[in-house]
Amino acid sequence: MEHFIDTYLYELRKVRDEKTIKKKEYLLKHLQDYSEDLPAFDQSEIFSFYEYLKNKNLKETTIRDILKEVRLFYEWLQEQGLNLKFDEKALKKLFQSKKSQEALKSKKKYYSDDEINLILNAIRGAVEGISTKHPIYYILTIFLLCSGLRISEAVKVRKKDFEVKRILTEEGEEKEVWFVKVREGKFGKERKALIYFFRPEWKRIFEERLKKLKPEDFFFTYAVKYPKSVKVFTLTDKTAKWFYWKLEKELREKGYEIEVNAHRFRNTYITKLATKGFPVNLIADWVGHSKISTTMDVYMEAEREKQLEAILERI
């Protein structure tokens, strides 16, 4: 393969500038890493190559450039008399499928588990090229996912607003059920919301944090160390929204097409509880929807999105 690529680039140097040649060389290097021989790119091989590139954490735009350059390289090979297949219809089908999936993601109302992991990892500094954020934003994100509160409601929660009830299950086992009191909800209404820890480690994070707070303390009080002092702040909805806006911007710059906003955390809470079998009327009470139809709409749209995603994955 190396001989053919070198010859291809040599011929192109006669008509293209060196910057373009270097880019093409970089793009074709991924083909060399993928296979020692020149593969026949039928639909199965094209999709396999795409998944290989995806697993290298390359940007979607870079993957497209690689596939397009490989197609041009194979056209040149065919002109040289080599009988090597490259299924252009399959490539077009792949691009259309991925375009549909990206469009779906851009308007999707809830987060998948992979998207939740991406956001949390970015906050922890576990995504390459993104610095570690203050731990308060990790806790805030978990809280929004587990409580369904609006961000304006969440930042006003105090330690005394948490309530842990112990109930007996049908099997006779004791189980904890967590609630949070929303004192200043939308339209000034008070309510209680179920806190459902979708992962056991999240509950432990909350337990440890509550131990450090006094009853009147805001839950989202945090300290920032400066060279000569430590200052204590209470998170505001404006600061939190600004944080998520900046985080989304950072992720997009690294090639991750994802929206990061509190409302989608809220909708994720609704969707997860509904799929676990919680009655929609109870969920509506917990999230403070005045109409049960609003809650039902979120759930039904999420179900339609999941069905569409499953279809697109099979294309």
Curated annotation (Swiss-Prot):
The active site is at residues 150, 186, 263, 266, 289, 299. Keywords: DNA integration, DNA recombination, DNA-binding, Plasmid, Viral genome integration, Virus entry into host cell. GO terms for biological process: chromosome segregation; DNA recombination; establishment of integrated proviral latency; symbiont entry into host cell; viral genome integration into host DNA. The keyword DNA-binding applies. It comes from the Bacteria. The keyword RNA-binding does not apply. Residues 1-78 form the Core-binding (CB) domain. One of its GO terms (molecular function) is DNA binding. InterPro entries: CB (IPR044068), DNA_brk_join_enz (IPR011010), Integrase-like_cat_sf (IPR013762), Integrase_catalytic (IPR002104), Integrase_recombinase_N (IPR010998), Tyrosine_recombinase_XerCD (IPR050090). Residues 106-313 form the Tyr recombinase domain. Transmembrane segments: none annotated. May function as an integrase. Belongs to the 'phage' integrase family. PANTHER family: INTEGRASE_RECOMBINASE AQ_AA09-RELATED, PHAGE INTEGRASE-RELATED. This is Probable integrase/recombinase aq_aa09. It comes from Aquifex aeolicus (strain VF5).
